[in-house]
């Protein structure tokens, strides 16, 4: 995967390319979803990801996206080679974000939160597969989504709890946790999500707090990749939301979109977010998850950087604050 740097890239991007961590308990990792537009145009190969993380960005934490495997995870030799590459480069593989969605048609698979038992059973089996994949590349967790267009909060709490409990039990034998991200809908309500985690009460269940506005959007026309740029009808306070989810966090997504001329994300006060994290008991990786490229791909109206430049901008911002 090759990158070319345009002459128009803002100068702030290059002001700090060496990782300087003020807090040794917090580290920076990179989420493969940052390169989703390149994946969709055939310019990103997940096999190259460990090398990109290490040699292009000087990081040692890799966070994966299930879609980027392009079904190659079913090949034992492929997975073995990916794991060996990671180990040889000194990369810590952390989390796989699991999505069951056709990126051509945007059709989504069965939901773990469905009110239909048959649908939940299919979703559970799908995610068990990814628990096995995660264990083979030494990731500690898979991230799941809980989407449901029907049912009360109580109904979805019950069905989600049942599904995740089964995944937690299955994952315990692999040393792999099941974690839930605030990904819109009911999961955008941090209090609801905290109740879910507490009700399940398992060491193999947790949260993945996400900085993004979309993640804390509790009500919108439809929640999927194709409506990333649509307005939210009911927004949860994301700073309070992150604070509420942190006690159960097994990872953090530093979602970024667009930057001003000083290098700050214009949608999220990163300094405020990082201070909230520092005041918590969280230790571990904060993942760069640049989404500006995807917003641009789906018609967003903004001054979005290309994936590589967006990752560098997010990395620079995090390094300044951690």
Predicted regions: what they are:
Residues 4-12, 20, 51, 85-209, ...:
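Active-site acidic/histidine proton-transfer and metal-coordination neighborhood
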Residues 11-33, 38-41:
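C-terminal segment of N-terminal export signals and the immediately downstream linker at the start
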Residues 26-33, 60-64, 93-98, 142-144, ...:
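Hydrophobic faces of well-ordered beta-strands that scaffold small-molecule active sites
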Residues 30, 53, 86, 123, ...:
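Conserved, mostly hydrophobic/aromatic
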Residues 33-35, 65-69, 98-101, 147-149, ...:
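Active-site beta-loop-alpha junctions enriched in small/polar residues
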Residues 45-65, 137-138:
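Catalytic domains of carbohydrate-active enzymes, especially glycoside hydrolases
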Residues 61-62, 161-275:
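Acidic/histidine-rich catalytic cores of soluble enzymes
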Residues 61-84, 146-152:
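Glycine-rich, proline-tolerant flexible connector loops at the mouths of alpha/beta enzymes
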């Amino acid at each position: 995967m090759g990158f070319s740097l345009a002459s128009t890239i803002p100068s702030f991007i290059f002001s700090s390319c060496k990782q300087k961590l003020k807090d040794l308990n917090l580290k920076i990792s990179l989420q493969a979803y940052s390169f989703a537009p390149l994946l969709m145009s055939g310019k990103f190969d997940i096999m190259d990801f460990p090398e990109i993380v290490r040699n292009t960005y000087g990081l040692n934490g890799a966070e994966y996206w299930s879609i980027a495997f392009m079904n190659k995870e079913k090949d034992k030799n492929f997975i073995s080679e990916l794991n060996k590459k990671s180990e040889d480069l000194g990369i810590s593989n952390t989390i796989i974000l699991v999505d069951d969605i056709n990126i051509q048609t945007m059709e989504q698979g069965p939901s773990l939160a469905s009110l239909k038992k048959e649908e939940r059973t299919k979703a559970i089996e799908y995610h068990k597969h990814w628990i096995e994949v995660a264990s083979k590349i030494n990731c500690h967790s898979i991230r799941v989504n809980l989407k449901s267009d029907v049912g009360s909060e109580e109904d979805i709490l019950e069905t989600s709890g049942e599904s995740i409990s089964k995944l937690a039990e299955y994952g315990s034998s692999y040393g792999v946790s099941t974690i839930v991200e605030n990904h819109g809908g009911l999961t955008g309500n941090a209090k609801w999500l905290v109740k879910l985690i507490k009700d399940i009460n398992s060491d193999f269940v947790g949260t993945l707090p996400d900085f993004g506005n979309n993640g804390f959007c509790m009500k919108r026309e439809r929640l999927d990749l194709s409506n990333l740029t649509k307005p939210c009808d009911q927004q949860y306070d994301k700073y309070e939301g992150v604070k509420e989810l942190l006690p159960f966090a097994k990872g953090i997504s530093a979602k970024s979109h667009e930057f001003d001329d000083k290098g700050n994300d214009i949608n999220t006060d990163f300094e405020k977010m990082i201070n909230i994290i520092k005041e918590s008991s969280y230790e571990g990786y904060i993942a760069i998850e640049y989404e500006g490229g995807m917003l641009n791909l789906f018609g967003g109206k903004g001054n979005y950087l290309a994936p590589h430049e967006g990752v560098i901008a997010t990395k620079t911002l995090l390094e300044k604050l951690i």
